[in-house]
């Protein structure tokens, strides 16, 4: 059995916020669970080429926007799932940070970070 608190896990600056990675590849669970903070007012061009991801909003507000401009509003109680390695923009409202519980499959190593200085969607 694995039991961990937020104070016991690694905190990674993923590029536009923080990610507390509760379960990673080394735990041999087959998935990652993270508590992800998205900085207020940030817009992140993201794509997970090797992972599927689902995010459940627990605090704050924001949007996830597809490359064709389709916009989905995020608020506590809303989940979105990237089931086709979708390129997308994750946007946090300027009023405050957005908090998500993120699940990745296959699991992350735990040290991954995004790079937003490229001309393409940041990926890992």
Model-identified regions with their sequence ranges:
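Glycine- and acidic-residue-biased ligand/ion/polar-headgroup-sensing regions
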Residues: 50-62
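A short hydrophobic beta-strand segment most commonly corresponding to one strand
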Residues: 54, 81, 96-112
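Short beta-strand His + acidic residue motifs that chelate non-heme Fe in jelly-roll/DSBH
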Residues: 45-46, 64-65, 82, 88-95
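Short acidic-glycine-tyrosine-enriched beta hairpin
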Residues: 68-85
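A short, N-terminal "cap"/entry segment at the start of jelly-roll beta-barrel domains
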Residues: 1-31, 115-124
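Conserved short histidine dyad/triad with adjacent acidic residue
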Residues: 34-49
């Amino acid at each position: 059995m694995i039991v961990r608190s937020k104070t016991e896990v690694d905190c990674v600056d993923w590029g536009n916020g923080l990610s507390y990675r509760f379960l990673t590849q080394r735990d041999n669970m087959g998935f990652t669970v993270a508590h992800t903070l998205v900085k207020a007012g940030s817009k992140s061009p993201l794509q997970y080429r090797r992972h599927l991801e689902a995010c459940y909003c627990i605090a704050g507000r924001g949007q996830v926007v597809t490359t064709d401009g389709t916009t989905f509003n995020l608020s506590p109680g809303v989940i979105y799932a990237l089931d086709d390695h979708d390129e997308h923009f994750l946007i946090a409202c300027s009023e405050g940070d957005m908090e998500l519980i993120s699940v990745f499959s296959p699991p992350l190593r735990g040290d991954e970070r995004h790079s937003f200085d490229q001309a393409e969607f940041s990926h890992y």
